[in-house]
């Protein structure tokens, strides 16, 4: 008979019967009784009253009965800690049993009983099991150490178990090695500062030897451990890669992904000129392709990981486009992921093939998939310039189908194509206008309105078209209302005599009849601009917009590097670092790739890609910065925790492109009516000077100005939150960067009459993802008139949202009295990283590659420094002089710097000896940064 019979009873008074049976002299009856107890426990009945009777059954030679009793013990020991001590003697005895299965069972159960009271009794049996002659017992004991460490870390360290665990890495049995590595990794993860896994070439060699012989899960533990090792040079990295490569052909997909992670990390250290590098690239493709023949759930995980790999090294899969073509029976989540990878791999060589596929997808029945396919065609046009004409033609064919949702998506993406290729495809506007009546989705209506407003001079009846939208103004979404307001103002500036009545009508609707503050604000801005200075209004509203970037929503480079280190884990599926979704007090280690060798810089790497925004795949409307209370009130400001504050899991980290073209100009972007766009018509950064190109090609002959480091400039503390606004709490502070770490140096003063305790701090989302790296620790209560100084470490892995101004930081501080809010501006130079020195050839190539429109020129006045002093001072704040020369008595410093999010800024600083005015020319793919970089230059040089 099967064990199902134990689950069918519903008798009353069963506990008493079970008690009698458990104390029976007959072994069979006793075993039956224990089975009934376990069955009752499994279905949720409380059988804890039988604890002493069940524990008495431990004294048996029957392995099955012993397992059942141990199962009961694990479940009820926490609720009956005093009774659990009764079992200790049996554990000690079982750990010396001649049967290794019983010894292992005892030590496994010991680790699972999470009761502090009995842990010290278990140390001696565990010590014996760690040195047991049987490898099965040793491997079980290794895992037990990690479990015991979780309950009482200090006890494990005092008893020397960690050293024993390290010794097991040299064990002769590969499974013991794997479990020891797994246990040490688990402990090291929860205690990042412990430096437990201090690997060296000898121990790495032992791990690689064990790798070939242990089970698949043991291999995963070892591979994950190898991924945390930093080889001393490229030769060692290559040696490890050679020994890990055979794992790529393993049947278990988890082993394959762990091997890919190791290879992706160590490839950073290999020179691209090596034959082995090319061989490795070829070997990586087949296993990744094989993963796509698994069941859909595994395919999805594989595709999310491949998405990261393709962003980091597109060359691995550039010839494998066909495997990402969608199959008719793929689930929607697999289809959408494949579509995204197809766009990432699209190039001039395969674009015809890709477009043919996308056009076919656009005729499918799944509406969501069709929409994505139409958007993908637009993204291809923006990414591969040579295909733009064919893409536009394909989109027009789709518009002719008159399928409503296809037409609407096509109009949205054509608007982006107009932005990317101005004055090239405007001939299709007439076709678009024919479909005005069928548009019912806000995004499509807003896109069409933008097109009409932007090209009003080419559309004869533009005023009639916009007037038709105006009739139902109050019924439109905010996105459409904002876009309509801007479009009519553009039309008025282009045809003032014919549209005066129309512009007055829309301004009246926006400012007097609307309850929406964003709409009212924008209406008032336009009204004042038009009434005070129509010429300025024209310069602002009709300013030339920067081109949108050809990069399609790449993950920000530093985040991408971190996610590559988490291939095969949940982080690689969410595309978020673990600290964004893992709760609890464990320390979070931020992993990063090893530094690249000089010749391994990938030309296709996002590191060197323009810092552009998503062009085709539209981000959601960015929420308003609003008043400071808005977002900050929703932040979790609970008591301090031992780990860094966690970002809300709903925030898509890394998905917001910070400074790229998609956000450059809110006029005409997909984010129509984003509330933060109340100054949507802000002019594009003007070109403030002619491009300084003369003599740049001589850079190879120049000598580099290298200065000595004297520490990054630190501004004096300023009052950020006066006491009168914070119920007696005054907060002053400044920002510093020392040895690569950013800190917020705070001074808290209690000017109230009561003691202040329970401090906590949280930042709102901001342009560079600044976030506290640790809780705000005020170790003693802050008494009246007492001041305390705190250095709060910061990191840049928080949630990203473009702020206005760019360096605006909104902060919430909580104590036992209330929650207080303030905002401050952080100096951009604290974000300048230490590896911001570009080599000369790269500098020259990048300078030429960045469009002249992105160049800005500034004057720095009243600066008494000579050239060498200026260079040294700037270098101490991570602005590096790449080259220096003298032209007609004028010193020219060519400099580079890099921000924490991977954006490079190139500079030319002209210094005329004896003249206190310097001329600074800046070039950057994200022009919004230039003004703040200039301010950093001025601050550093003048202080």
From Swiss-Prot:
Principal subcellular localisation of the protein: membrane
Region entry Disordered, spans: 584-621
Compositionally biased tracts (Low complexity): 594-616
Record-listed 3'-nitrotyrosine modification sites: 574
Membrane topology: Peripheral membrane protein
Expression (tissue specificity): Widely expressed.
Entries under Pfam families matching the protein: Adaptin_N, Alpha_adaptinC2, B2-adapt-app_C
Classification via InterPro entries: AP_beta, AP_complex_bsu_1_2_4, ARM-like, ARM-type_fold, Armadillo, B-adaptin_app_sub_C, Clathrin/coatomer_adapt-like_N, Clathrin_a/b/g-adaptin_app_Ig
Family classification: Belongs to the adaptor complexes large subunit family.
Function: Subunit of clathrin-associated adaptor protein complex 1 that plays a role in protein sorting in the late-Golgi/trans-Golgi network (TGN) and/or endosomes. The AP complexes mediate both the recruitment of clathrin to membranes and the recognition of sorting signals within the cytosolic tails of transmembrane cargo molecules.
Quaternary data: Adaptor protein complex 1 (AP-1) is a heterotetramer composed of two large adaptins (gamma-type subunit AP1G1 and beta-type subunit AP1B1), a medium adaptin (mu-type subunit AP1M1 or AP1M2) and a small adaptin (sigma-type subunit AP1S1 or AP1S2 or AP1S3).
Protein name: AP-1 complex subunit beta-1
Originating species: Mus musculus
